[in-house]
From Swiss-Prot:
<dbReference type="GO" id="GO:0005886">
    <property type="term" value="C:plasma membrane"/>
</dbReference>
<feature type="transmembrane region" description="Helical">
    <location>
        <begin position="363"/>
        <end position="383"/>
    </location>
</feature>
<feature type="compositionally biased region" description="Polar residues">
    <location>
        <begin position="1"/>
        <end position="14"/>
    </location>
</feature>
<feature type="disulfide bond">
    <location>
        <begin position="213"/>
        <end position="230"/>
    </location>
</feature>
<feature type="transmembrane region" description="Helical">
    <location>
        <begin position="423"/>
        <end position="443"/>
    </location>
</feature>
<dbReference type="GO" id="GO:0006814">
    <property type="term" value="P:sodium ion transport"/>
</dbReference>
<feature type="transmembrane region" description="Helical">
    <location>
        <begin position="165"/>
        <end position="185"/>
    </location>
</feature>
<comment type="similarity">
    <text>Belongs to the amino acid/polyamine transporter 2 family.</text>
</comment>
<keyword id="KW-0915">Sodium</keyword>
<feature type="transmembrane region" description="Helical">
    <location>
        <begin position="73"/>
        <end position="93"/>
    </location>
</feature>
<dbReference type="GO" id="GO:0015186">
    <property type="term" value="F:L-glutamine transmembrane transporter activity"/>
</dbReference>
<feature type="glycosylation site" description="N-linked (GlcNAc...) asparagine">
    <location>
        <position position="278"/>
    </location>
</feature>
<protein>
    <recommendedName>
        <fullName>Probable sodium-coupled neutral amino acid transporter 6</fullName>
    </recommendedName>
</protein>
<feature type="transmembrane region" description="Helical">
    <location>
        <begin position="186"/>
        <end position="206"/>
    </location>
</feature>
<dbReference type="Pfam" id="PF01490">
    <property type="entry name" value="Aa_trans"/>
</dbReference>
<keyword id="KW-1003">Cell membrane</keyword>
<keyword id="KW-0325">Glycoprotein</keyword>
């Protein structure tokens, strides 16, 4: 089978002989034209880039509403469930020879399953890309202006216009990266994005000792006398705790990128891909935990849902804070081409099926998707709210529901086996998280700003 394009063909299941569970070093993908694939580290960086996004800014707020120990337990559970759900998907690849999420849906639920998964991936990734571009449109001008000495230097400048900046970065940076035929090429930009996230974490740790506790109550830096505010809570249970669960539940969602990355992995075996997944999830877990912990220990109960805004309040025009703000925006920007790849693959699979790679189809679908998300980011002012409902549903399906359901439908393991019980558990968790996420969003809408 040729693997020289974005739209990988799928081997006929009847022709595939599954490998035994004790032969995890045997290549999972069908043998065909041999080209060197992506390195292990490149694949791991791509997965980490797919995992980490702007959501890292809200994890300190989640810790404030669940407690340090409660947050750590929940984060560990979510990371473990994400790794396990990917394990089930790779196990199905082992058993069937299928190498795409859409094809697993077709195997489990026939053609409606394929369409369902492809549409879910499209909605999820288009929503994520639109939200990321919307963040860039609103935050990038302020991040650039922050480096200027005075407001008079920026008055009337072109970079004050968020739409202009958004179009420029999309055409100059996102489009060339999105046009690349292989997701493995994005390993370099993904490593840069991960370094930006590390930089953010280091700054959060360092700035812990730059802001006094109790926090200043006004611009003259007079201190609040309530020293009890400087005590970390181990466990917190309140109505706001429900808001933290969805944020954490989706913090390890990378499942739409797993299959494209796996298809291009050099010497693709289940063990090798699972190792790449485990490394990515572990490093993301460490970055999440450290940044959330020190962000919380800096502001305690006063931490907001967007961590960097709190630093702007107490450390105005701090060069490190301004730099890390720009770094996070650049990391978000470099994530867009990566999550564009599975969306384009889903479009091509819906429109062209399993035909050979075509540069014309590849380019047209790329322009179509980027134009769509750009228009959504520019002209839909509440795009994050619109995709909040849909995104919570699609994320739940991709992270929990589909892996569990597909395993139960495709696998021949007894229902009482460990993996079957785990698949049922994923289904239940998916339903609970999905209902909770929708409830939180609806309550937020009812209560208003």
């Amino acid at each position: 089978m040729g693997r020289n394009g974005a739209n990988h063909s799928i081997q006929t299941v009847s022709e595939y002989e599954p490998i035994g569970e004790d032969e995890e070093r045997t290549p999972l993908l069908p043998q065909g034209v041999q080209t060197r694939g992506s390195s292990f580290m490149s694949s791991a960086f791509n997965l980490m880039n797919a995992i980490m996004g702007s959501g890292i800014l809200g994890l300190s707020y989640a810790m404030a509403n669940t407690g340090t120990v409660g947050f750590s337990i929940l984060l560990l559970m979510v990371a473990s469930l994400a790794a396990y759900s990917i394990h089930l998907l790779l196990l199905l690849c082992d058993k069937t020879g299928i190498n795409s999420y859409e094809a697993l849906g077709e195997k489990a639920l026939n053609r409606p399953g394929k369409i369902l998964v492809a549409c879910t991936i499209l909605i999820q990734n288009i929503g994520a890309m639109s939200s990321y571009l919307f963040i860039l449109k609103t935050e990038l001008p302020a991040a650039i202006i922050g480096f200027m000495r005075s407001d008079s230097e920026t008055s009337g400048k072109w970079f004050e216009n968020g739409v202009t900046l958004l179009i420029l970065v999309t055409v100059i940076i996102v489009l060339p990266l999105a046009l690349l035929p292989k997701i493995g090429f994005l390993g370099y930009t993904s490593s840069i994005a991960f370094l930006f996230m590390l930089f953010f974490t280091v700054v959060v740790v360092v700035k812990k000792w730059s802001i006094p506790c109790p926090l200043p109550i006004n611009s003259t830096l007079s201190l609040s006398l309530n020293t009890s505010e400087c005590t970390a809570q181990l466990f917190v249970i309140s109505s706001k705790s429900a808001y933290a669960v969805p944020t954490m539940a989706f913090s390890f969602l990378c499942h739409t990128a797993v299959f494209p990355i796996y298809c291009e992995l050099h010497r693709p075996t289940k063990r090798r891909m699972q190792r790449a997944t485990n490394v990515s999830i572990f490093l993301s877990f460490v970055v999440y935990l450290i940044s959330a912990l020190f962000g919380y220990l800096t502001f305690y109960s006063h931490v907001g849902s967007e961590l960097l805004l709190a630093y702007n309040t107490y450390l105005p025009r701090d060069i490190l804070v301004m730099s890390v703000r720009l770094a996070i925006l650049l990391a978000v920007l470099l994530t867009v081409p990566l999550i564009h790849f599975p969306a384009r693959k889903a479009v091509l699979m819906l429109c062209r099926g399993e035909r050979e790679f075509s540069w014309l189809s590849h380019t047209l679908s790329c322009f179509f998707i980027l134009t769509l998300v750009l228009l959504l980011a520019i002209f839909v002012p509440d795009i994050k709210n619109v995709f909040g409902v849909v995104g919570s549903t699609t994320s739940t399906c991709l992270l929990f529901v589909y892996p569990g359901m597909f395993f139960l439908r495709i696998s021949s393991e007894p229902i009482r086996s460990f993996n079957s019980v785990g698949a049922v558990f994923l289904l239940v968790i998916g339903l609970v998280v999905g209902v909770l996420s929708l409830s939180v969003i609806i309550v937020s809408w009812v209560q208003g700003p």
